[in-house]
Swiss-Prot record:
Keyword Chloroplast: no
Domain F-box: 27-76
Listed name of the protein: F-box/SPRY domain-containing protein 1
Keyword Lyase: no
Coiled coil: none
Biased composition (Pro residues): 10-26
Keyword vocabulary terms for this entry: Ubl conjugation pathway
GO-annotated biological processes: proteasome-mediated ubiquitin-dependent protein catabolic process; protein ubiquitination; synapse assembly involved in innervation
Gene name of this polypeptide: fbxo45
Subunit structure: Probable component of a E3 ubiquitin ligase complex.
InterPro entries: B30.2/SPRY, B30.2/SPRY_sf, ConA-like_dom_sf, F-box-like_dom_sf, F-box_dom, FBXO45-Fsn/SPSB_families, SPRY_dom, SPRY_FBXO45
Length: 280
């Protein structure tokens, strides 16, 4: 009888379980990772992923960009920059791993150059094959439409009759017949011929550079620093630590690429992006 009575009594209602708490906002969750853990994770990522991580929160951005020689940049540099470039003096004027990674990203393009040249495995040096009656050039992977930028260029072989450094738009040709000053041969490029010191644009000579009497000739291996100012629309040059002055003014509001052109067979030209120029 007692069992029947107990069976008739309804069980008390079971309270519904509370829903789980919502996850903390991403910014708060990211703050929980120790800096050493963040650096360890970041050290396995490629550059596009690192860019994305830098946008997550201020702490991640500081972790990535606060120390330009951190394990994050050292790991990435050792993975993408060739051993030759790191071992030799190619990058001797770049003091941090981050700067070396950036220089590699701005190197000469193996897909935007004459068919008669190739970019060596170090990622910074152009080699011109011994092709007769041809002028051959290359542009960098990245161009500039704003800001101030500097890069170094030097020849590691004979110049021949024409050896030009300068800038070019994406429309400027990178190969032509004969031995000519390819950079500066049309309105899409601006160049300085290191052989005769002439400035060239739109197929015309725009005077001699630098503007001094008995200007010294370029010596093989000598590093020339190129300074592009897209705010003032000027292109200037330095030799060693000597500022040679502005070579071109009134540059267009367009995307301009560092570029070189060469004519001598088996000569080599190296270009290294330095970043923002140091004033003074």
């Amino acid at each position: 009888m007692a069992a029947a009575i107990n069976a008739a009594v309804p069980s008390p209602p079971v309270a519904p379980s509370a829903p789980p708490p919502p996850p903390p906002p991403l910014g708060q969750a990211s703050d929980r990772f120790p800096s050493l853990v963040l650096e360890l994770v970041f050290s396995y990522l490629d550059l596009p992923d690192l860019r994305s991580c830098g946008l997550v929160c201020k702490r991640w951005y500081r972790c990535l960009h606060g120390d330009k020689n951190s394990d994050v940049w050292r790991s990435l540099c050792c993975r993408i920059v060739s051993e030759e470039a790191l071992r030799t003096d190619i990058l001797c004027n770049l003091r941090t791993y981050k700067a070396k990674v950036r220089a590699f990203q701005h190197g000469l393009s193996s897909s935007d150059c004459s068919r008669n040249v190739f970019i060596k495995k170090n990622g910074f040096t152009l080699h011109r094959n011994p092709i007769a009656q041809s002028t051959d050039g290359a542009r960098t992977k990245i161009g500039f439409s704003e800001g101030r930028h500097a890069w170094e260029v030097w020849w590691e072989g004979p110049l021949g009759t024409v050896a030009v450094i300068g800038i070019a738009t994406k429309q400027a040709p990178m190969q032509c017949q004969g031995y000519v000053a390819l950079l500066g041969s049309d309105d899409q490029s601006w160049g300085w011929n290191l052989v005769d010191n002439n400035l060239l644009h739109n197929g015309e000579v725009n005077g001699s550079f630098p503007q001094c009497n008995n200007a010294p000739k370029y010596q093989i291996g000598e590093r020339i620093r190129v300074i592009l100012d897209m705010e003032d629309k000027t292109l200037a040059f330095e030799r060693g630590y000597e500022y040679l002055g502005v070579a071109f003014r009134g540059l267009p509001k367009a995307c301009l690429y560092p570029a070189v052109s060469a004519v001598y067979g088996n000569t080599e030209v190296t270009l290294v992006y330095l970043g923002k120029p140091l004033d003074g």
